[in-house]
């Protein structure tokens, strides 16, 4: 065991501050990172890795972008946190509302978990209903209401997926199969008048990378509208990754509430939830639904977010990045086929994922669970040795940044070829 990991385990549970970082899913010990720049991570031994985790999505410009660092450095001179309104909060809020379809107002928080938790509380308060629908394999943070897995039948209420989550909360959560349109219609036919909201990752990035099938998001929109339920698109991951307007712009489906995070914070701890004036004015202090946060709207985080979003508004930003994502994902699939290894890839926007399976298309959680995870683990460690860092779990999406060059893609494809020859 490395000294760094041994030291960490003495004072931090499991040696990490988020479980996936511990490498338990893939085996071995986590890599401790010292610095990062552009598309590269450097560990404490100064080994360089081409990074496709990108801090789990936020670093769409690449690590330590000069403009973002300059904005943060400038803002730091005036203080770290005030606990009072600042003009930069309004500046970023206005920009996001002008970008995201149907968003009139937005509330900043400090994490994606806070954003989804608050969005659900708002939906329940606004509708006067308690039940929510979520989808198996979608992750919306670690709040109690959302750590619920599917029950024994399609429409049974869920059961807690973690000790410490009261069973009474599970009674209000219905967990359905992602991309199952008929199941959604059945649920609304049976209990539509009890449903406060549906929350969904428009592209499921926490069971690797699963785009919605044609008609799935549209059905959610239609059923919510008919039942008077709110549709929450959890764009913490997809926001600004499928284009400037996120998944809702990419797929043309307008939610009632959007949650954001990751990219929007430029690498700082930021989350947000927003929607129409009518819905958002139901939040305190204008409305009865309480939500608050000591560090919400932190000025340094706002500066990082504003600097990031301003660069994303460049009309030429996304096209080359989408093309590189396609080249990388399809290139790895081609190499796997040449090596006789069953592999399917999904990609959309700047997100991508690989599945070691005979299936030609992977569209739901059950298919993801049936993949060859031991082979993925070997692939992960092989790439790590080659100097390529992908997510240390087969259920997590990969990402690209504007800092990744054609040479980085070529390097990665050669690394994948080398690994396929060994596994």
UniProtKB/Swiss-Prot annotation:
Pfam families given in the database record: Aminotran_3
Catalytic EC class: isomerase
PANTHER family, sorted: GLUTAMATE-1-SEMIALDEHYDE 2,1-AMINOMUTASE (PTHR43713), GLUTAMATE-1-SEMIALDEHYDE 2,1-AMINOMUTASE 1, CHLOROPLASTIC-RELATED (PTHR43713:SF3)
Source organism superkingdom: Bacteria
Annotated localization: Cytoplasm
Catalytic activity: (S)-4-amino-5-oxopentanoate = 5-aminolevulinate
Name of the gene encoding the protein in the UniProt record: hemL
Identification of the protein by name: Glutamate-1-semialdehyde 2,1-aminomutase
GO MF, one example: glutamate-1-semialdehyde 2,1-aminomutase activity
GO terms of biological process kind: protoporphyrinogen IX biosynthetic process
Enzyme Commission code: 5.4.3.8
Organism: Saccharophagus degradans (strain 2-40 / ATCC 43961 / DSM 17024)
Similarity section: Belongs to the class-III pyridoxal-phosphate-dependent aminotransferase family. HemL subfamily.
Keyword vocabulary terms for this entry: Cytoplasm, Isomerase, Porphyrin biosynthesis, Pyridoxal phosphate
Pathway this chain belongs to: Porphyrin-containing compound metabolism; protoporphyrin-IX biosynthesis; 5-aminolevulinate from L-glutamyl-tRNA(Glu): step 2/2
Subunit structure: Homodimer.
Organism lineage string: Bacteria, Pseudomonadati, Pseudomonadota, Gammaproteobacteria, Cellvibrionales
UniProt modified residues of type N6-(pyridoxal phosphate)lysine: 262
Cofactor: pyridoxal 5'-phosphate
Gene Ontology annotations for the cellular component aspect, listed alphabetically: cytoplasm
Keyword Isomerase: yes
């Amino acid at each position: 065991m490395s000294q760094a990991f041994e030291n960490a385990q003495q004072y931090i549970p499991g040696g990490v501050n988020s479980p996936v970082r511990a490498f338990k899913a893939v085996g071995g010990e986590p890599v401790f990172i010292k610095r990062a720049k552009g598309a590269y991570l450097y560990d404490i031994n100064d080994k360089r890795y081409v990074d496709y985790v990108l801090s789990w999505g936020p670093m769409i410009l690449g690590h330590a972008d000069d403009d973002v660092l300059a904005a943060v450095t400038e803002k730091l001179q005036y203080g770290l946190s005030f606990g009072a309104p600042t003009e930069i909060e309004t500046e970023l809020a206005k920009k996001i509302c002008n970008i995201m379809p149907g968003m009139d107002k937005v509330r900043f928080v400090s994490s994606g978990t806070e954003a989804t938790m608050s969005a659900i509380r708002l939906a329940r308060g606004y509708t006067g209903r308690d039940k929510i629908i979520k989808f198996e394999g979608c992750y919306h943070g670690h709040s109690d209401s959302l750590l619920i897995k599917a029950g024994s039948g399609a429409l049974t209420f869920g059961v807690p997926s973690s000790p410490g989550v009261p069973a009474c909360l599970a009674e209000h959560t219905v967990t359905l199969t992602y991309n199952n349109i008929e199941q959604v219609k059945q649920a609304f036919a049976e209990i539509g008048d009890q449903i406060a909201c549906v929350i969904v990752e428009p592209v499921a990035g926490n069971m690797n990378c699963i785009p919605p099938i044609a008609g799935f998001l549209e059905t959610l929109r239609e059923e919510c509208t008919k039942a008077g339920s709110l549709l929450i698109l959890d764009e913490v991951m997809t926001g600004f990754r499928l284009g400037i307007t996120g998944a809702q712009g990419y797929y043309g489906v307008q939610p009632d509430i959007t949650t954001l995070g990751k990219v929007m914070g430029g690498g700082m701890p930021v989350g947000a939830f927003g929607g129409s004036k009518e819905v958002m004015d139901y939040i305190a202090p204008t409305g009865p639904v309480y939500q608050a946060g000591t560090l919400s709207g932190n000025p340094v985080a706002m500066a990082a977010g504003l600097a990031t979003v301003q660069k994303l508004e460049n009309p030429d930003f996304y096209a080359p990045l989408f093309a590189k994502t396609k080249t990388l994902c399809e290139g790895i699939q081609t190499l796997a086929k040449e090596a006789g290894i069953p592999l399917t890839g999904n990609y959309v926007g700047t997100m991508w994922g690989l599945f070691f399976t005979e299936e030609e298309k992977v569209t739901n959680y059950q298919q993801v669970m049936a993949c060859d995870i031991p082979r993925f683990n070997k692939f992960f460690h092989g790439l790590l040795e080659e100097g390529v860092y992908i997510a240390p779990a087969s259920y997590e999406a990969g990402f690209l940044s504007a800092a990744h060059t054609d040479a980085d893609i070529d390097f990665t494809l050669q690394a994948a070829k080398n690994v396929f020859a060994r596994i």
